[in-house]
Amino acid sequence: MLKNKFIYGLIGKEIDYSFSRKYFNQKFKNEGLINNSYENFDCKNLSQAIKVLKQKNLKGLNVTIPYKEKIIPYLDTISKEAKDIMAVNTISFNNQGKLIGHNTDCHGFQKSLFENINKKTKNALILGTGGASKAIRYVLKENSIKYQTVSRKKNKGDFIYTELDRDIMSNFELIINTTPLGTYPNTEKCPDINFDHITKDHILFDLIYNPIKTSFLNNGKIKGAKIANGYNMLIYQAEKSWSIWNEIN
């Protein structure tokens, strides 16, 4: 039996699709970290998720929907970014056994975003107002990029989809999809925008990474827009989680 086995894992619901388990277990193999393993903790409800926090040999956890916000009251403290965003996607354990919540989505998005835009980008349109949009709004605000949001319901966003005419769309260089529309296996789905209003002056960013090119991105590319998916964001947030778990600056 291996000594000092360290367990990492992902807390979420219906997470068979998980990128994280495959990514980290391959990382452990590549780096010869034979005492490390990364597991999926598929929790049907919050009480199951809380039980995971008490397991032995846990070195670090990631958290995904629907527990990014619900898990917060059960942690001992959270980082400034997590507090501002009010969502946690990474949990570390200090030497005293305290549970500390972090948000590495903001790090991943910021690093990936600035690979795809220039410093002149000043206006963004965010499709979706759910939990996934929280870290996005935080990053845009921190970088002085003005944004407005689109929702299916008027009272939740600045616009509803039917209001997005050519004049409105021309005001935003950057359009970010934070909805799950287009995620595998429902790849034919797409946010309800008129792609005739998309031009070569637009940048379309989709948080989805599977498939690599969603209907949203494909329709944008046809109109000449620059496109980017969420894969690099995922890599960057995962590596940030790893550095937090191992206290790497």
PLM features per residue range, with description:
Residues L2-N116, N219:
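Phosphate/diphosphate ligand-binding glycine-rich loop within oxidoreductases
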Residues K111-S112, K226-I248:
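Active-site capping/gating segments
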